[in-house]
Regions:
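General marker for long, soluble alpha-helical cores
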Residues: 14-220
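Sec-dependent N-terminal signal peptides
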Residues: 2-13
C-alpha cells in the first residue's frame, strides 16, 4: 500500500522538478512557484502545461508585474479547462489529447466559443486535421474574420475532405483577398462557398473512398 502511494508522489515530485528546471533563471521565484503549482495541478487533470509555462516566461521577459503574470496564468488554465470541455462535448477522445486542448485554448483566446470547439471536434475529420482546424480557426478570428464566418469556412473545408495543407493555407488566402479590397468576412465567405461546392462534388481522389481494386492478371 505504501509503495502504491509512493509511486504517484515520486512522479509528482519529478514533474514539479522538471517544471522548476524549465523556469529556473527565467522568472522570479514567486512566479516560478505559482507556475509550478498551476502546471502540476493542470497536468494532474490531463491538461497541457506548456501554455502555462510559456505565459510565465513571456510575462517575466516583458517585466510585467507579478500579479498580472499570475492572473494571466490562471486565465490560461481557465481556457485550457474550457477547451477540454468543448472537445469532450464534441469528441471525447480528443479531450484526452493535450495538443488538441492547447489548440482549442488558442482558438478560445482568439474569440471562438466552447460550442465552436465542440462543433469542430465532431466534424468527423481525423484528429490531426481537427487540431489543424482549431489553430486555423483561431488564426482567422485573429485576422478579423467574424466567428460565424470562420466556423462556416473551417467546418466546410473539413467536411469537404480537404487535406491539412489546404486548411493551413486559409489564413494566407483570406489575407490575399483582403489585399484586393474586400473585408475579412467577405473573403472568408467566398472561400466557404468554394469549400461547399467541393463538398457537393465529394472528397478529392484517394480520400473518403476505398482504393480501386487492382486489375486482375490476364488468363494464360
Amino acid at each position: 500500500m505504501l509503495t502504491s502511494l509512493a509511486l504517484p508522489l515520486a512522479l509528482l515530485l519529478t514533474q514539479q522538478q522538471s517544471i522548476a528546471d524549465r523556469l529556473a533563471g527565467r522568472v522570479p521565484p514567486d512566479i516560478a512557484a505559482l507556475a509550478t503549482e498551476l502546471a502540476t495541478d493542470a497536468a494532474g487533470r490531463g491538461l497541457p502545461i506548456d501554455p502555462i509555462i510559456q505565459k510565465a516566461i513571456e510575462g517575466s521577459a516583458k517585466r510585467v508585474p507579478a500579479e498580472r503574470v499570475g492572473a494571466a496564468m490562471r486565465l490560461v488554465v481557465t481556457q485550457l479547462d474550457a477547451a477540454a470541455g468543448g472537445l469532450r462535448d464534441g469528441n471525447a477522445a480528443l479531450s484526452a489529447d493535450t495538443v488538441a486542448i492547447a489548440a482549442g485554448a488558442f482558438a478560445l483566446t482568439a474569440g471562438l466559443s466552447g460550442r465552436d470547439i465542440a462543433t469542430l471536434a465532431r466534424s468527423g475529420s481525423p484528429p490531426a486535421e481537427v487540431i489543424v482546424g482549431l489553430r486555423v480557426a483561431g488564426t482567422l478570428v485573429a485576422l478579423g474574420v467574424p466567428a460565424s464566418e470562420t466556423m462556416t469556412l473551417v467546418t466546410g473545408t473539413l467536411q469537404a475532405g480537404r487535406p491539412a495543407g489546404e486548411l493551413l493555407a486559409l489564413p494566407g488566402r483570406v489575407q490575399a483577398e483582403v489585399a484586393k479590397g474586400v473585408t475579412p468576412a467577405q473573403a472568408a465567405a467566398g472561400l466557404a462557398r468554394a469549400a461547399a461546392a467541393q463538398a457537393r462534388r465529394g472528397p478529392p481522389p484517394g480520400r473518403g473512398q476505398p482504393p480501386p481494386h487492382p486489375t486482375p492478371p490476364p488468363h494464360p
